């Protein structure tokens, strides 16, 4: 575990600036350095289907996608990229293309011939499951490292010769057995998986590398990228740019909120150089959401500075801030209570009921609430904490919510105070505001900060309450409805995932305490839905495998029977409730 006081992931956690990185050229596009944050997406087709792949690539470029990724699961698919690229360029489209490779090093070498960038997965480029976790030893771990250098060095040399870029793309769901043996199923395992491959690039003096550490859990993704930034400093490696995303985010508002909670938090930390919002929708729908998220989380050069004591804080492993409970409107907030969701008292009067809100906030000037409106208020408290009685509910409503609440928590810790913190956000009905609030709250609860949430500003107050609950669920802080983990679809997907996602939501959406993964294939599916209670995974054309946790329990089910078989499985486990 790293010591934050000696090896931080950013220079100042109270003043966000974009991380300085190497600049990577991908065709005509630039990633990192002083280049704008690049938006990318992925086609749902295989290169062998040339017409559809070209059409989707052109459609993505038309809506402003800065880089298009195409999966190439086989050597034949990688070879098919030649014709795809010819037609894309013949259409006058200059958007750079990246090939996405799993399990097939030969396909990766072939793809280098035709596209500007190739993504490889350290979890399966060399370590393809020859040894199971039970068979791993310290000796096999070291031998595996030698095999990585032996296999990956020629690939790096070829990329360097051709002027291509490489993405070392780690997925939480597909860590190798070697890494899990040494580090466990942890963010450390994700980071060291990337570091191992990056060491080969460094040895070859090749710096046209982008790094990614993705997970379907925003908390895991945030922690992993932070830790990677710190480890690069510790290893004295170059500061390579980061491609940031939350895998399997889902569809609709839930997918957007989960993406904002994870990607937005990293944008606010200055750690993102290119992003993809992974939605179980048409790929074209991802691009405007990503563009809006970048705008919403834009770092401001004139953002205020927070002058507070800086205390040791581990930003790489989740731990909720310890607080004492405070009672507000008859409801306990803080301590061992879940993060509460409230609404303003005047909104309660307007609607005549609290709806699903757990408490009514009488006002930011009503005891025990203590409102700080700007950085000077926090600095004043830090200088004289005894002026505010213990057992208060603190709230920061000034600019830069994330930095302000971090500073407030640091000031409370310096004074040895454990008063709870209310996260209060003002919002309009715009998507930009919604994404920003999700990023703010997602970042803070990932840091273990916040004991209650009030979102204010919607015309219909109950929408504010619903949004607060949805953000807490997106950030894996509190569950209030069925949690769906679904992949965005690509050329590896074995069924119509958008259609199936809709059917599963309709059939299982009433199960509040259940988490269900809907995955198109076996590459990342079983791992990325590791947090799910049950899983629906493509096992072959027209065939589905059902999972309970990480275990496949029903295989080779005809697709037309799979949803009802999932109902039966949940019933067998005593988790089913009638709607």
Would you name each region that the model predicts?
Residues 37-43, 68-70, 97-101, 118-120, ...:
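Hydrophobic faces of well-ordered beta-strands that scaffold small-molecule active sites
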Residues 136-152, 157, 179-323, 328, ...:
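Catalytic alpha/beta core domains of metabolic enzymes, predominantly
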Residues 2-41, 156, 160-162, 299-348, ...:
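N-terminal amphipathic alpha-helix/helix-capping segment at the start of soluble metabolic enzymes
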Residues 44, 63-88, 122-143, 209-218, ...:
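Glycine-rich, proline-tolerant flexible connector loops at the mouths of alpha/beta enzymes
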Residues 72-114, 348-351:
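N-terminal active-site wall of soluble small-molecule enzyme domains
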Residues 34-52, 97-104, 179-191, 247-257, ...:
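Active-site mouth loops of central-metabolism enzymes
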Residues 94-132, 138-158, 163:
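Hydrophobic or amphipathic alpha-helical targeting/insertion segments
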Residues 65-69, 115-132, 268-284, 394, ...:
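Glycine-rich phosphate-binding active-site loops on the catalytic face of alpha/beta enzymes
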């Amino acid at each position: 575990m790293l010591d934050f006081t000696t090896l931080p992931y950013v220079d100042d956690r109270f003043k966000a600036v974009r991380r300085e990185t190497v600049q990577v050229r991908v065709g005509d596009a630039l990633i990192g350095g002083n280049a704008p944050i690049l938006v990318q997406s992925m086609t749902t087709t295989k290169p062998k289907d040339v017409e559809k792949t070209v059409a989707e690539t052109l459609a993505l470029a038309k809506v402003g996608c800065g880089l298009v990724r195409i999966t190439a699961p086989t050597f034949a698919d990688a070879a098919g990229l030649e014709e795809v690229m010819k037609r894309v360029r013949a259409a006058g489209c200059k958007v750079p293309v990246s090939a996405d490779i799993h399990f097939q090093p030969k396909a990766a070498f072939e793809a280098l011939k035709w596209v500007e960038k190739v993504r490889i997965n350290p979890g399966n480029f060399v370590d393809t499951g020859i040894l199971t976790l039970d068979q791993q030893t310290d000796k096999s771990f070291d031998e595996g490292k030698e095999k990585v250098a032996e296999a990956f060095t020629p690939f790096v040399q070829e990329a360097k010769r051709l002027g291509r870029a490489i993405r070392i793309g780690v997925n939480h769901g597909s860590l190798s057995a070697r890494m899990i043996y040494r580090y466990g199923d942890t963010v450390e395992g994700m980071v060291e998986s990337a570091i191992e491959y990056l060491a080969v690039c460094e040895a070859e003096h090749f710096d046209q590398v982008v790094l990614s550490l993705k997970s379907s859990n925003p908390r895991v993704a945030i922690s992993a990228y932070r830790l990677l930034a710190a480890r690069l400093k510790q290893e004295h490696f170059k500061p390579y740019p980061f491609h940031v995303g939350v895998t399997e985010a889902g569809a609709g508002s839930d997918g957007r909120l989960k993406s904002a909670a994870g990607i937005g938090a990293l944008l606010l930390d200055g750690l993102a150089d290119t992003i993809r919002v992974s939605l179980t929708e048409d790929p074209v729908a991802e691009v405007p959401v990503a563009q809006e998220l970048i705008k919403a989380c834009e770092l401001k050069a004139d953002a205020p500075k927070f002058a507070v004591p800086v205390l040791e804080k581990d930003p790489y492993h989740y731990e909720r801030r310890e607080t004492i409970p405070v009672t507000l409107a008859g409801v306990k907030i803080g301590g061992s209570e879940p993060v509460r969701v409230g609404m303003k008292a005047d909104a309660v009067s307007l609607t005549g009921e609290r709806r699903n809100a757990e408490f009514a906030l009488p006002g930011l000037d009503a005891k025990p609430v203590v409102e700080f409106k700007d950085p000077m208020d926090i600095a004043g408290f830090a200088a004289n904490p005894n002026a505010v009685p213990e057992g208060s509910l603190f709230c920061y409503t000034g600019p830069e919510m994330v930095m302000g609440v971090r500073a407030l928590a640091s000031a409370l810790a310096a004074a040895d105070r454990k008063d709870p913190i209310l996260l209060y956000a003002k919002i309009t009905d715009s998507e930009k505001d919604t994404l920003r609030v999700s990023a703010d709250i997602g970042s803070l609860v990932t840091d273990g900060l916040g004991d209650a949430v009030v979102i204010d500003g919607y015309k219909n107050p109950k929408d504010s309450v619903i949004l607060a609950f949805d953000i807490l669920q997106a950030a894996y802080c509190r569950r209030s409805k069925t949690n769906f983990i679904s992949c965005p679809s690509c050329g590896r997907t074995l069924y119509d995932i958008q259609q199936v996602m809709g059917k599963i939501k309709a059939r299982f959406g009433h199960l509040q305490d259940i988490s269900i993964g809907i995955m198109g294939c076996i590459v990342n599916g079983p791992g990325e839905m590791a947090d799910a209670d049950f899983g629906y995974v493509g096992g072959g054309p027209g065939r589905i495998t059902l999972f309970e946790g990480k275990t496949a329990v029903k295989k080779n089910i005809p697709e037309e029977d799979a949803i009802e078989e999932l109902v039966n499985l949940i019933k067998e486990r005593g988790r089913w409730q009638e709607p």
